[in-house]
């Protein structure tokens, strides 16, 4: 669709997690949150704009780790580690710009938010589900806490690029610029 620029409002920057929550006036189909525990070896699908360009990434769950985000906070943060499996389109280099993008399971539910990468090791780190729920709860907006899922998506290792394209076209996944 046409490119639009909208200012975010009701911005909430988490002091505890490398996450932020905000609203825009535009509307897009909402994704739901997975309630089942993550399982080692499960598939995940990351959608966003690495290097400023649309892309979809397939990864496989390795486990939990703690990182120091090194930004505003000096604490360690629990995150989920994923082994990168495939990029579409195929490109090399950084995933910078993917941060903040949703990570979905095979049922199209949110299981994380991309936070940082370890390029040398082929790892992607995402926020832990508890961190997402904590950030949403602290935002005070009931729409974040119990979203009304309106988007139903089935994703697999072959179809995920077209699913990502559809999510970007519907603006369920959008490029966000922070300054």
Regions found by a protein language model. Name each.
Residues 1, 150-179:
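N-terminal activation segment of mature serine protease catalytic domains
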Residues 7, 43, 58, 100, ...:
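Conserved beta-strand residues within beta-sheet cores
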Residues 20, 25-30, 55-144:
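Active-site region of chymotrypsin-like
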Residues 22, 46, 61, 174-176:
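Generic structural hydrophobic/aromatic packing signal, biased to beta-strands
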């Amino acid at each position: 669709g046409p490119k639009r620029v909208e200012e975010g409002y009701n911005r909430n920057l988490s002091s505890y997690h490398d996450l932020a929550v905000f609203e825009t006036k535009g509307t897009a189909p909402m994704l739901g949150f997975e309630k089942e525990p993550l399982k080692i070896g499960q598939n995940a699908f990351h959608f966003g704009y690495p290097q400023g360009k649309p892309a979809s990434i397939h990864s496989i769950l390795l486990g939990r780790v703690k990182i120091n985000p090194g930004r505003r906070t000096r604490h360690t943060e629990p995150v989920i580690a994923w082994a990168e499996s495939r990029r579409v389109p195929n490109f090399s280099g950084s995933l910078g710009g993917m941060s903040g993008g949703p990570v979905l399971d095979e049922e199209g539910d949110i299981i994380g938010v991309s936070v940082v990468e370890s390029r040398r090791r082929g790892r992607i780190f995402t926020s832990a589900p508890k961190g997402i729920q904590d950030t949403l709860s602290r935002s005070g907006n009931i729409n974040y806490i119990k979203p009304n899922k309106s988007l139903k998506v089935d994703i697999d290792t072959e179809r995920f690029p077209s699913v990502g394209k559809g999510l970007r076209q519907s603006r369920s996944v959008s490029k966000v610029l922070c300054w």
